């Protein structure tokens, strides 16, 4: 696959803007995520904490919600910031990003565009659980 023309600075700016909207009364750790969609849109999301930390919504999850609210599509490139610095998506979010961008999705890691195959080399295949259930 050819590398698309990605304006990483614009994505970082969108992620930083998203982080300003984070609801973080407990950790004070503001996270923003932004992505380029295959139709050219830039989408973003912020983290939303909960007193029960396990229920905290990661910025990447909010961003994927925005993807679908805007009509869907495939993620091409993603960047995440936490309190203004690069952060790498957690394991749950890596799987979520794989579902919506696949192996060719690029994620900025410490300023370096990194394919999802490096971040999540043994990803759970999309729809595999449901495909297996329908075969039985």
Sequence positions of predicted segments:
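Compact, glycine-rich, soluble single-domain proteins
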Residues: 47-61
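Short Gly/Pro-enriched turn/cap motifs at secondary-structure boundaries
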Residues: 23-26
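C-terminal binding/interaction regions
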Residues: 2-18, 70-136
């Amino acid at each position: 696959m050819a590398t698309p023309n990605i304006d990483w600075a614009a994505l970082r700016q969108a992620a930083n803007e998203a982080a300003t909207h984070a609801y973080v009364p407990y950790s004070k750790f503001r996270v923003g995520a932004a992505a380029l969609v295959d139709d050219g849109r830039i989408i973003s999301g912020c983290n939303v904490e909960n007193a029960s930390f396990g229920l905290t919504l990661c910025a990447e999850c909010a961003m994927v919600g925005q993807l679908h609210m805007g009509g869907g599509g495939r993620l091409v490139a993603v960047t995440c910031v936490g309190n203004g610095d690069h952060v790498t998506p957690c394991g749950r979010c890596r799987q979520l990003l794989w579902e919506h961008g696949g192996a060719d999705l690029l994620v900025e890691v410490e300023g370096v565009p990194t394919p999802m195959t490096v971040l999540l080399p043994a990803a759970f295949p999309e729809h595999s659980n449901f495909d297996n259930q329908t075969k039985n």
